[in-house]
Amino acid sequence: MEKLQGHRELDRSWQHNFFYPLIFQEYIYVFAYDHALNKLILLENAIDKKYSLLIVKRLITRMYQQNHFILSVNDSNQNEIFGHKHKKNLYSQMITEGFAVIVEIPFSLLLISSLEGKEIVESQNLRSIHSIFPFLEDKFLHLNYVLDILIPYPAHLEILVQTLRYWLKDASSLHLLRYFLYEYRNWNSLIRPKESISPFSKRNRRFFLFLYNLLVYEYESIFVILRKQSSYLRSTSFGALLERIHFYGKIKYLVKVKVKVFGVILWLFKEPFLHYVRYQGKCLLASKGTSFLMYKWKYYFIAFWQCHFSVWSQPRRIYINQLSNYSLDFMGFISNVGLNSSVIRSQMLENSFLVDNIIKKFDTIVPIIPLVGSLAKAKFCNGLRHPISKSGWTDLSDADIIDRFGRICRNLSHYYSGSSRKKSLYRIKYILRLSCARTLSRKHKSTVRAFLKRLGSEFLEEFFTEEDKVLSLILPRDSSSSGFYRGRVWYLDIICIHNLANDE
């Protein structure tokens, strides 16, 4: 364990080192096991944690055996790996998962340090995805235009390997990665035929998501450096973007190239009201500038991706929208900047007059149609929004059934608690509440009315309104409302929203 701690306490300049030799060490499964334990802090129902210990340890055992890295040169049609054609996908999957565990170790160390309150050198604190919404409420009210950008992905796997060259000094690890990427391309086991890199297969999603996120990280690192060339800008608007230390030596060169090749003058980066938010495979770039400036940003991004990363992005993937006439559809919310009119009576001496004030307000609305579609797909209701029983859960105990329904309801309540209009959320809660009652009544071979009459209507009502009761105790209640607290409260401990279909 002392040797393990020694590896974890390595110098923080982890960009210049790699853990490739650990693949051939017996105790690499300890890293994988520790990684799975730390992941429990973030994801309550982490699915990937179940393979981290077992598969990586099996991988090491098989790599110690002989004649596994033997390719068949006599039979080109078989293209065997590890000596057995029917096992090649299994072994390759284990290696990619072990590779993903190892390369994620530096990021895990940064995340653990942030959770423990330790200072992270040369990086900003990691924040919840829900910190985006208070940020938008404060900043987007003063902006005019927004770029809705679909981040491009590389069409060739070699681009991913070239990206990793800036991170890894170990050539053998790059050769290993390149070897498996090209084998995967031949087997069509990682990427589906004739499809892009974004729809990853479920078995190898973790490995390719890491490579894709690393490429996006490269985009943003250079973008941050160019943006910091202007002393008028603040870095806090970029959220959780980690800085690349070894890029600082290339700042002057990059700026000169940008100006010379693209004809982009530096005042493009000196927009004092410029805010950037990334979510999933998209990003938003909002500015107080004119539409002409946003067009310059649009074609700058296209040239930037094409010339420096050999990634082609079509102009129709970047949309320019005016915030006053545009609704942002992202992260499960429909958000817009609306104009609210408020009339104030003012009196000066003996004269009184009315003042009509126009105030901008950032509204977040719960999308009822997609949520009902998710409930129908998960068999909680039919296409007509009528709640139905969850037949697959009737074999569970009553406590487990209530716990599953309650977990879904709490996740939705926490995630959409900051929305300005909660009427749609109450409809979703009603569907879940009645679906839970139908499931329990079906299990006990009774009707919903008889079941609720026997246990009391407060049986489910008290359970599903527990969060509202807690809020009503700690927060002031609206005097005009006799119900529970209905204000906007963002739960900033939210990391992700669970898919309803995964709760089965």
UniProtKB/Swiss-Prot annotation:
Sorted alphabetically, which InterPro entries does this protein's record hold? Domain_X, Maturase_MatK, Maturase_MatK_N
Task: Return the Pfam families for the record.
Answer: Intron_maturas2, MatK_N
Gene Ontology cellular-component terms listed: chloroplast
UniProt lists the family membership as follows: Belongs to the intron maturase 2 family. MatK subfamily.
Q: What are the subcellular locations of this protein?
A: Plastid, Chloroplast
What PANTHER family does its record include? MATURASE K (PTHR34811:SF1)
Q: Which GO terms describe its biological process?
A: mRNA processing; RNA splicing; tRNA processing
Keywords on record? Chloroplast, mRNA processing, Plastid, RNA-binding, tRNA processing
Is the keyword Cytoplasm assigned to this protein? no
Single GO MF annotation: RNA binding
Would the keyword Plastid turn up in this protein's UniProt record? yes
Role description: Usually encoded in the trnK tRNA gene intron. Probably assists in splicing its own and other chloroplast group II introns.
**What is this protein called in UniProt?**
Maturase K
